[in-house]
Each structure stands twice: as C-alpha cells, then as structure tokens.
C-alpha cells in the first residue's frame, strides 16, 4: 500500500519521542546523561533513522542538547531556569484545573481515585520513581479534562524541560517524609468531586508549592 512505510516510520519516531519525553519528565534521565543514537536504536530494536529524528525533535524544543559523535545529552536544569519554569507552570496548571472542574465525569473521578490509591501505595512502599510517575499521571489526567489541548501541550513540555532536575530526588528524599504531602492530593480529589473550583485551585497550589520546595532543597545543598 503506497505510503505505508512512511507512516510506519513516522509512528516509530513518535513512539521514541514520547518514550523519551516520559523518561525526561519523571527524572529517569540524569542531567548530563549521554544518549548515543546507535546504542539507543539497538536497545529499542529499530533502525537509527527514527531514533535520530526523535532525538532531533527534542533538541528543537531544548529538551536535549547535541553532542559530538552522533550523541545527545540531557541538559542541566539550573536554579534560575527552574524558577522561570515553575512560575509559568504555576499559572498554567492552576488555569487547567479550574477549567477541568466542570468537565470531569463520574468515570474520570473513579480513574483519579484509582491513581490516588496507587500514589498512596507507592508512598507506603517507598518507591520514589513510582511516586513521581503516578503524580504525573494524576495531574495530567485532570488537566486534559480542561479540553484545551494547547494548554496541556505547554504544561507537558514544561515538565519535560524541568524533569531531569527530579532525578536528584530519587536518592535524596525519603518517601516516608511525603506522607503529609499525599494528604493534599486527597483534598484535591474531594474538591474536584464537589466541583469546588476555588478549592481545587487552592489544593493544587499547595501541592505545587510543597513539591517545588522539596525540589529546591536539593538545589540548595
């Protein structure tokens, strides 16, 4: 069928790009980490071309940097850059949660409840990677119900840009210390169920301020 090969190639590129974005956004890739095109292609079991194109796409949005010898690096996230990203995120995410309130269905709320239970379990197990991952899924599930795809795209891109800085939390934070922080997620879900727009904004603001404070502690060490 004409064009099938090209469509498959594009889908492979998008697959690699989305996978790398996810890894970047949860801090799975350490700042300064070197990604070699050939090695990555071998790990994924695909040709170099879609992998290289995916990496170049991430370079175009400053999520990766070009390095010599067909390699790319995960950029450092400086304190000043982190400040700027978090100030923008704060405004955009509070907007998204307020817009989502009226659009959440009973099924959406049930799915959020399941994610919150997974977040609680991850905290109790001390699984920092899972905490960060489920936090991301929980928040984005809410934001996407704003029905504003451009807004959500901007938020996700900012998470990709700041994500490498989260890597420092994996060994520096004891998940047991996050027990009180998880309570704010329960309060947020309760506000969502009550369709309390201002309550949702307040709860999310508390969550973001606490999470940002934890991250800044690592930068100030």
UniProtKB/Swiss-Prot annotation:
InterPro entries noted in UniProt: GntR_C, TF_FadR/GntR_C, Tscrpt_reg_HTH_GntR, WH-like_DNA-bd_sf, WH_DNA-bd_sf
One Pfam family matching this protein: FCD
Entries under SUPFAM superfamilies matching the protein: GntR ligand-binding domain-like, Winged helix' DNA-binding domain
Sorted UniProt keywords: DNA-binding, Repressor, Transcription, Transcription regulation
Phenotype of gene-disrupted mutants: Disruption of this gene induces 30 genes and represses 10 genes more than fourfold. It decreases biofilm formation, increases extracellular indole, leads to colanic acid overproduction and elicits mucoidy.
Domain HTH gntR-type: 10-77
TM regions (residue ranges): none
Expression triggers: Induced by LsrR, LsrK, MqsR and TqsA. Repressed by LuxS and YgiV.
This protein's record includes keyword Acetylation: no
Domain of life: Bacteria
GO biological process entries: negative regulation of DNA-templated transcription
DNA-binding region positions on the chain: 37-56
GO MF annotations in UniProt: DNA binding; DNA-binding transcription factor activity
Role: Important for biofilm formation. Represses expression of McbA by binding to its promoter region, which prevents colanic acid overproduction and mucoidy.
Protein name (database record): HTH-type transcriptional regulator McbR
Lineage of the organism: Bacteria, Pseudomonadati, Pseudomonadota, Gammaproteobacteria, Enterobacterales
């Amino acid at each position: 069928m004409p064009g099938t090969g090209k469509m498959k190639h594009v889908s492979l590129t998008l697959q690699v790009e989305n996978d790398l974005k996810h890894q970047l956004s949860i801090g799975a890739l350490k700042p300064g980490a070197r990604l070699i095109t050939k090695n990555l292609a071998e790990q994924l079991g695909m040709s170099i071309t879609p992998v290289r194109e995916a990496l170049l796409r991430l370079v175009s949005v400053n999520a990766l940097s070009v390095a010599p010898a067909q390699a790319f690096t995960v950029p450092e996230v400086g304190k000043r850059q982190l400040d700027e990203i978090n100030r923008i995120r704060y405004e955009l995410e509070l907007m998204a949660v307020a817009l989502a309130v009226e659009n959440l269905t009973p099924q959406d709320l049930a799915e959020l409840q399941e994610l919150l239970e997974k977040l609680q379990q991850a905290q109790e197990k001390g699984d920092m990677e899972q905490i960060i991952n489920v936090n991301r899924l929980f928040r984005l599930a809410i934001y996407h119900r704003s029905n504003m795809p451009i807004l959500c795209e901007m938020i996700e891109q900012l998470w990709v840009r700041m994500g490498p800085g989260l890597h420092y939390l994996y060994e520096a934070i004891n998940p047991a210390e996050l027990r009180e922080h998880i309570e704010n997620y329960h309060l947020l879900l309760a506000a969502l169920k009550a369709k309390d727009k201002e309550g949702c904004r307040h709860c999310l603001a508390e969550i973001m301020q606490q999470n940002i404070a934890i991250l800044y502690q690592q930068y100030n060490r």
